[in-house]
Amino acid sequence: DPQRDIFELLIIPMAIARNMPVFGICRGIQVLNVAMGGTLIQDIESQKGIPTKMHQQEPPYGAPVHTVRFERGSIFERITGVTEMQTNSMHHQSIKEPASRLRVDGYAEDGIIEAVSAKDTDRVFAVQFHPEYLSDHDVYAQRLFDHFVKLSRDYQNEKK
């Protein structure tokens, strides 16, 4: 949807400039990266030679299909308390070149980027997987949402 692309590519830099919390999920990590100047792999299988079956699971989406490894000391390790997380996966695109203002914080076993955060603020982070399908039975996925809610409340309180 070209209009959605335009809207999201405009609103993300505005939110970051206002120091608003941003939590990108799936397409959100991709749009965040492009909005900040990075590039995408348009099709993992044809461009990287990695079978997309690892990244395009069938239902149930709450079932983990691969491991994401978080960098030690990353915001994701601080939020979840772990350096490895079992995740779902439903995408055929991914980050190619990360934006210079983003830090790569997590990878799938095949090297696909699965987690990033802003270098200059702890309020901007994103994942390629779908924690919303995992959070009812995975404490680590739920911690991502809990952290985002806390950031949002802090932001709201700062504006009072």
Model-derived features: positions:
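Amide-donor transfer/coupling interface in amidating biosynthetic enzymes
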Residues: 1-20, 45-160
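Catalytic nucleophile loop
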Residues: 13-41
